[in-house]
């Protein structure tokens, strides 16, 4: 793996900090979520999925090898 550039992606995950309180007659007031346009295309969306698949590959392969030996 020498000579291969390493890339680091930072992922931001929204966390709700305020608790919605019931208003009149016990109803909760919800905000309508607006769709945001995806910046950067599909690559930032696919990178974590690809990384997870690469990380899971050795485990899947070892299970397949053990199953084939039985």
From Swiss-Prot:
Lineage top rank: taxon:
Viruses
Propeptide feature ranges:
1-26, 42-70
Q: Name one GO cellular component term.
A: viral nucleocapsid
Pfam families per record: Adeno_PX
GO molecular function terms attached to this record: DNA binding
Marked site: Cleavage: 26-27, 41-42
Query: What keywords are annotated for this sequence in UniProt?
Result: DNA-binding, Late protein, Virion
Keyword flag GTP-binding: no
Chief site of localization: virion
Subcellular locations according to the entry? Virion
Outline what the protein does.
The role of the precursor might be to condense the viral prochromatin for encapsidation by virtue of the two basic domains.
Family that this chain belongs to: Belongs to the adenoviridae pX family.
Q: What name is this protein filed under?
A: Late L2 mu core protein
Q: Give the species this sequence originates from.
A: Bovine adenovirus 2 (BAdV-2)
Q: Give me the gene this protein comes from.
A: PX
